[in-house]
Amino acid sequence: MKNLLIIFTLLFSSVFLSSPSFAGWTKVDEGGGNTFYVDFERIRKHDGFVYWWELGDYLKPQMGYFSAKSYNIGDCRLFRVKVLSYSWHKEPMGGGTGITVNIPDNWRYPNPKSIDEYKLKSVCSR
């Protein structure tokens, strides 16, 4: 019985804890059944810029998708952000194969007291 418990524990850990869908995501906002996360564990800084992943998880599908992930670059000195890549996912928490979307190559300045301002301040301070 003890061996069965050990095997079950190892199997459970390898399936759920190693899943990239759930690793590292920290909830930063929620509303209307939607939840938004930042992966603070994978923040990278280089040449004065900060790079990070975001995830939006939707209660009701958005255009047929239950989640979306983006990879972003932030300029902490000028306090602006640009999305480098964006993908929609059929499964929650960024699961399943992503459909990459073309995005405009422009910098955005977060509105004061917005979730975007909070996220940029959070990643810049890490």
At which residue positions do the language-model features occur?
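Hydrophobic helical h-region of N-terminal Sec-dependent signal peptides
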Residues: 6-13
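Positively charged n-region of N-terminal signal peptides that target proteins for export
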Residues: 1-5
